[in-house]
Amino acid sequence: MVIKFLSALILLLVTTAVQAERIRDLTSVQGVRQNSLIGYGLVVGLDGTGDQTTQTPFTTQTLNNMLSQLGITVPTGTNMQLKNVAAVMVTASLPPFGRQGQTIDVVVSSMGNAKSLRGGTLLMTPLKGVDSQVYALAQGNILVGGAGASAGGSSVQVNQLNGGRITNGAVIERELPSQFGVGNTLNLQLNDEDFSMAQQIADTINRVRGYGSATALDARTIQVRVPSGNSSQVRFLADIQNMQVNVTPQDAKVVINSRTGSVVMNREVTLDSCAVAQGNLSVTVNRQANVSQPDTPFGGGQTVVTPQTQIDLRQSGGSLQSVRSSASLNNVVRALNALGATPMDLMSILQSMQSAGCLRAKLEII
């Protein structure tokens, strides 16, 4: 009875230690991807927050071209003072296997000096691909997430007002040709290159589908032999993508955003014992203007302005602190927090730790 209990306990510990994920969560099918679309159009119906046409002549030119296509002729030399129109760029993504008549979301962004696109309506805008072919037509009311108000020279703004979205705002008019179903092989691409994971996925497919069904070509690509025909390949991929593989531990990595000062690390990061001293150097420059005037008004003196500059240099910190060896993410966080460093200081500390061989991780600065 005791032996059975211990066996069950060991099996439970092993199953909880190993993390299994589906192949579909780790890979994508090569060639099955989105395609970017772009277009140029006009937004109308703005509440006086559109482009200043004297500074954005392309807005007036676009409006004249559109009116002429509708049979309306604007006299030459007419100075149209428009406030409710804005020139915009429209972007969208054409999904894989997108069919004619299907709707997609679009993003609308101001091109000129419009103050806000809130309440505007995008007029019919053709969306083109890199081959200059029209694949979709966009039109509809824009939803802007920000808000703002101004009066008496003061203004308040929350979030961005010069961009918005139109949900299901474009209709697909042309389908992209697809090579899916052509040939007897397909390539699965790993989201992150990993030789061991690529080989493990190939071995898993071979165990279920037979030896030679899958081959790992490199650290990112697994070539799979599939039956011919669209329906047969769909069924084959559906079975393969639901197979589960044991995920190997990730590479230890620390990602630093130099613009925002944020530091992110995964659970594989470890620290070796080291000593850290971090000092802050601040320089303050204060400049004042001293005015010197003569005591006697009729003595022929002259008022003189002399600048006075004061420079203050302060250096704080610098005491040597010990950092213990840490093998788990929680201990790493505690060890770094014990230094009392700001995120900006932490970036320099982590770089120095890696140079000294104390940080067991890849350091990536974005």
Curated annotation (Swiss-Prot):
Keyword Signal: yes
UniProt cross-references to Pfam families, sorted A to Z: FlgI
Subcellular localization(s) per the UniProt record: Periplasm; Bacterial flagellum basal body
Keywords assigned by UniProt, alphabetized: Bacterial flagellum, Periplasm, Signal
Main location: periplasm
A single cellular component GO annotation: bacterial-type flagellum basal body, distal rod, P ring
GO process annotations (BP): bacterial-type flagellum-dependent cell motility
Signal peptide extent: 1-20
GO molecular function: structural molecule activity
Subunit structure: The basal body constitutes a major portion of the flagellar organelle and consists of four rings (L,P,S, and M) mounted on a central rod.
Similarity section: Belongs to the FlgI family.
Entry-linked NCBIfam families: PRK05303.1
Biological role: Assembles around the rod to form the L-ring and probably protects the motor/basal body from shearing forces during rotation.
Record-given protein name: Flagellar P-ring protein
Species this chain originates from: Escherichia coli O6:H1 (strain CFT073 / ATCC 700928 / UPEC)
